[in-house]
Amino acid sequence: MANDYLFTSESVSEGHPDKVADQISDAILDAILAQDKYSRVAAETLCNTGLVVLAGEITTTANIDYIQIARDTIKRIGYDNTDYGIDYRGCAVLVAYDKQSPDIAQGVDRAHDNNLDQGAGDQGLMFGYACDETPELMPLPIHLSHRLVERQANLRRDGRLPWLRPDAKSQVTVRYVDGKPHSIDTVVLSTQHAPEIDLPALREAVIEEVIKPTLPADLIKGDIKFLVNPTGRFVIGGPQGDCGLTGRKIIVDTYGGAAPHGGGAFSGKDPSKVDRSAAYAGRYVAKNIVAAGLASRALIQVSYAIGVAEPTSVMVNTFGTGRVSDETITKLVREHFDLRPKGIIQMLDLLRPIYEKTAAYGHFGREEPEFSWEAADKALALAEAAGVEPAVQVA
């Protein structure tokens, strides 16, 4: 890669239609796990103008009011007015859940005991990543993109910018020099708004109140290109503007394109699905490698076969930044992390109802108490085993 280059990532707000769907799916998952932690859940959601469709496969002993959960989630996000295209009080909610296929269940239904040979819920490959660009050990472009739409939501909720509406998108382009963030080049922010606000006033307020307070001062060098609502009017948004579906923001959910993605979405899936649990484990492993000072960048790939507990492969790539060889780090990963599906569930305590919070503003790089995969609690052991000094700054 060139020594001087631009890299871009994007995020979307909790009111984006795909994120509405993700949050409904994970709210349903949480409600089920709160009653029956051994449930099998694959909850998919579609939302459009005035309509929510809940479908998928659920096997559980829990007694859940799915319709009320969908309405409560839509209300929490802020769609509480028919002018917004969907209103939690009046939208139609259709429910079409089936049970998990017994052909799938036979390989994974060993969860009620301590048998660590519970098989993976599907085949697939998953990635984890960490780097030293931020205290959270995340790539800077996706980190800033998340913080922008998160701030947009906070300003909407507290009434400081009362004309903001729930749907928004952000995009941040960072200039890198010698592989390190050098400066912010471009910030794009498109936000849904009330019809009475004029565009010049909106753009000024968004730049001054949303964007500038979010950007690191040391990366503001020269003129930054601010593109706020570049198409102009953005009154129609949310599920009215676009049909929302669970699992369509997998790059937003992870590393903003800075690392590969195995293709499996997260939301609505219980942790027997390695699409979710192994991706969380990959982040946990990668973050501990970087926190331990073994490398400044770490990419983990892990893969599985359906019904088989042991991963079919584990790979570590530190992109030449490792203080010991990638082969040595891979060996340490196998020694210090149990990457069998049941081992991951136990290691990260994943049978808790913790998932709705993950469904907006990124699954990774957020220091929430529930996000066990963000802990750097194995960094010291890894550093000692490798014979290196652990990294000093870990969020």
Curated annotation (Swiss-Prot):
- UniProt-recorded Gene Ontology molecular function terms: ATP binding; magnesium ion binding; methionine adenosyltransferase activity
Which species is the source of this protein?
A: Burkholderia pseudomallei (strain K96243)
Q: How is the cofactor bound?
A: Binds 2 divalent ions per subunit. Binds 1 potassium ion per subunit.
Name of this protein: S-adenosylmethionine synthase
Q: Which gene encodes it?
A: metK
Provide one Gene Ontology biological process annotation.
Answer: one-carbon metabolic process
Annotated residues for binding of Mg(2+): 18
What residues bind ATP, as annotated?
Answer: 16, 167-169, 233-234, 242, 248-249, 265, 269
The listed locations are: Cytoplasm
Flexible loop: annotated segments: 100-110
- Which reactions are catalysed by this chain? L-methionine + ATP + H2O = S-adenosyl-L-methionine + phosphate + diphosphate
Question: What does the UniProt function comment say about this protein?
Answer: Catalyzes the formation of S-adenosylmethionine (AdoMet) from methionine and ATP. The overall synthetic reaction is composed of two sequential steps, AdoMet formation and the subsequent tripolyphosphate hydrolysis which occurs prior to release of AdoMet from the enzyme.
Into which family does the record put it? Answer: Belongs to the AdoMet synthase family.
Pfam families in the record: S-AdoMet_synt_C, S-AdoMet_synt_M, S-AdoMet_synt_N
Q: Name one GO cellular component term.
A: cytoplasm
Q: In which pathway does it act?
A: Amino-acid biosynthesis; S-adenosyl-L-methionine biosynthesis; S-adenosyl-L-methionine from L-methionine: step 1/1
